[in-house]
Structure formats: structure tokens, C-alpha cells
Curated annotation (Swiss-Prot):
Protein's name in the database: Chorismate synthase
Binding site for NADP(+): R46
Stated family: Belongs to the chorismate synthase family.
Catalytically driven reaction(s): 5-O-(1-carboxyvinyl)-3-phosphoshikimate = chorismate + phosphate
PANTHER family: CHORISMATE SYNTHASE
InterPro entries recorded: Chorismate_synth, Chorismate_synth_AroC_sf, Chorismate_synthase_CS
Function text: This reaction introduces a second double bond into the aromatic ring system.
Cofactor(s) needed by this chain: FMNH2
Keywords: Amino-acid biosynthesis, Aromatic amino acid biosynthesis, FAD, Flavoprotein, FMN, Lyase, NADP
Length: 360
């Protein structure tokens, strides 16, 4: 439900228009000095209102850590992270109480929770709930970086604009496409879509470097299963593929297999079509996966819906502040959430000790 993880667990709480959102981390290694500036940097990458290309709901997204630290170091008790909601306008959502938005979870929440559903701003199924994912995941990401493990995500495509090259840092570009030409084209597309009152989707690629081999379990607890389980908690994510994914279905075995080789006395593979995972277990090569993020369902174009009280067809035009391309703000969410999963897997496998350190 609201808890993720095995040896290290994260529980999220709050809702889009509640007092706050947050996360509780239980099982994080003891004695780690949390780099608060680093955490806040990733919150800024995700923060709404930071660009004309994102939702204009302006939030500070400052993370408060109210437990789990002693003199700046993790002390073994649960870390509690809180992000206050300060820019809430619930009146925008009065219409969707009876008229569910097409493509949104309004209707399925009605089926499950009935009159008790939290519909304002999407409630606890809002994209706002990715803020605590970034807060918790960025701490895990900082820990992994201390081990030399790098987790990087970027926009591979937005609509029909595809970026097949990486020529810069994704966060240096407004669209998170790591190339100046692609960034400019994608920005123009988003502005055009936004002017029309519509939205557009995108694809996010992720690469994990320097992750050790031999991590993961076969069958139901494979590395792919663990990552996918977490990634699908991000609203609007509808697909994931590892390595070459669906392209493998049209390849020959002689093409899809990754031949083994030696490099500096270490076994490596010449290619990486399988994305660094075989049999659910990492092989020491970079972990690669891609996700598809659908267009934001809240758009300013009139759409047909059905009134839940009268059972009559009607039309809804969504009000409020919404992302024309929500995939852009999902990039740091994917990075941080992946980092949390990978650190949990490393703790499970014994690659990470419960103690980051016992002395300062």
C-alpha cells in the first residue's frame, strides 16, 4: 500500500491538499551524515513552479527532518521527512467531485473509496506524492554515490522529439533532454501543446553505473521486479523495459546475447542488450531501463465524462495548475526512487553494512 522496501523501508504519507506530505525511512544505515544541501537540490529539480514548462503551483518544498538524526548523523531510529503544502487552491477541484476527469484516478478512487475519497488535487494519488519519494530517495542516492555508484536519468523523448545523444547534464536543460538542440525542439513542442490547452508524454531513460554483480533474487524478487514495483508508484508511468526491452522480441539469439569478455582481469560483456541483469540478478554491467510517462490527464480542453450522481453524460473542462508534460518533473523522481530500491537490495545482499560508520 504505502510502504516500499524489505531490509530498508519507506512509508509515504499525506495528500496533495493536506497540511503536508512526507516519508518515513526505517532501516537506513547508522552513522551517515545526511547532506541536506544535496537533498534540497533534488527537491528543487522536482519542485513545481520552477519553470514555465511545469505546473505553476509554487511550493518551497523544503524538507524538514524531525526524527532519525543525532547531531546530523543517522542514529538507527526511523527518519521522518516532512514537506509542507503551502500553495493549495482546493476550489479548482469542486467540479471533479461528481465529474471524474478522463485518464485520471478520480473514477477508480470513487469505485474503491466512495464518498470518503480524497479528490482535491488528486488526494494521495497526486503527483504531489512524488515529493516525499525524492526526499527519501535522494538520501539513498547520496549514500550510493559515496560507494561510487551513479544513478542517472534523463528525458529520451517528448512527443515525437527524440534525443539519441547525451551531450550535457540533464538538469542543465529545462526539458531534461541532455542536448541543446533536442532541448530547444522539445521546449517549442511543449509550449505549442500548452497553448492549445493540451498535454504530452515522454520517455525517461535511466543508467546505473558501478553497481556490483550478484545482487538480486530469482523469480519474484528479481532486480527488475523490485525496480518496476517502485517505478509504477509514480503517477502517469504506464510502461517499463530493461535493456533493449521490446526490441529483443524481434532479434535473433545471436544478436540479443551479450558475449562475455575480459577487461583488466574482470569478466564483462561486449554488449549490454539485457541491461545488466540476467536471471533477475545483476551481472556487473550498467543497469539500463526506460519508462513511458503518459500525458498529464488534467487538460484545459473540454472532455466527455459521466456525472456520478445523475449517471448522465456531461462535459468537463479541467481548471487548476497542471503540468503540460509531467514527465519532465518525473526525471529526478525516477533517479531517487531507483536509488532507494538499489540501496535496499545492497543491504539485503550484505553488500552494505547496517553501520555506515561507528565513529566520526
Amino acid at each position: 500500500m504505502f510502504t516500499l522496501g524489505s531490509s530498508m523501508k519507506m512509508t509515504v504519507f499525506g495528500s496533495s491538499h493536506g497540511e503536508a506530505v512526507g516519508s518515513i525511512i526505517d532501516g537506513f544505515p547508522i552513522g551517515f551524515k545526511i547532506p541536506l544541501d544535496y537533498v534540497q537540490k533534488y527537491m528543487e529539480y522536482r519542485r513545481p513552479g520552477s519553470s514555465i514548462l511545469t505546473s505553476q503551483r509554487k511550493e518551497d518544498d523544503e524538507v524538514e527532518i524531525i526524527s532519525g538524526l543525532h547531531e546530523g548523523y543517522t542514529d538507527g531510529s526511523p527518519l521522518t521527512l516532512i514537506i509542507r503544502n503551502k500553495n493549495v487552491i482546493s476550489s479548482y477541484y469542486s467540479e471533479i467531485r461528481e465529474n471524474p476527469r478522463p485518464g485520471h484516478s478520480d473514477y477508480t478512487m470513487f469505485l474503491k473509496y466512495g464518498e470518503f475519497r480524497n479528490y482535491e488535487g488528486g488526494g494521495f494519488l497526486s503527483g504531489r506524492m512524488t515529493a516525499p519519494l525524492v526526499a527519501a530517495g535522494s538520501i539513498a542516492k547520496a549514500y550510493l554515490e559515496g560507494m561510487g555508484i551513479k544513478v542517472k536519468s534523463y528525458m529520451r523523448s517528448i512527443g515525437d522529439v527524440e534525443c539519441s545523444r547525451v551531450s550535457g547534464e540533464a538538469y542543465s536543460f529545462e526539458t531534461r533532454m541532455p542536448d541543446p538542440e533536442c532541448d530547444a525542439r522539445a521546449r517549442e513542442l511543449i509550449m505549442r501543446v500548452m497553448k492549445a490547452g493540451d498535454s504530452i508524454g515522454g520517455r525517461i531513460d535511466t543508467v546505473v553505473e558501478n553497481f556490483p554483480g550478484g545482487v538480486g533474487e530469482p523469480f519474484f524478487d528479481s532486480v527488475e521486479s523490485s525496480i518496476a514495483h517502485a517505478i509504477f508508484s509514480i503517477p502517469a508511468v504506464k510502461a517499463i523495459e530493461f535493456g533493449d526491452g521490446f526490441r529483443l522480441a524481434s532479434m535473433l539469439g545471436s544478436e540479443a546475447n551479450d558475449p562475455f569478455d575480459l577487461a583488466d582481469g574482470k569478466i564483462v560483456t561486449k554488449t549490454n542488450h539485457n541491461g545488466g541483469i540476467l536471471g533477475g540478478i545483476t551481472n556487473g554491467m550498467p543497469i539500463r531501463f526506460s519508462i513511458a510517462v503518459k500525458p498529464t490527464p488534467s487538460i484545459h480542453i473540454p472532455q466527455q465524462t459521466v456525472n456520478l450522481s445523475t449517471s448522465e453524460k456531461t462535459t468537463i473542462t479541467v481548471k487548476g495548475r497542471h503540468d503540460p508534460c509531467v514527465a519532465i518533473r518525473a526525471v529526478p523522481v525516477v533517479e531517487c526512487l531507483t536509488s532507494f530500491v538499489l540501496l535496499d537490495l545492497l543491504i539485503q545482499s550484505g553488500n552494505v553494512n547496517r553501520y555506515a560508520r561507528k565513529t566520526r
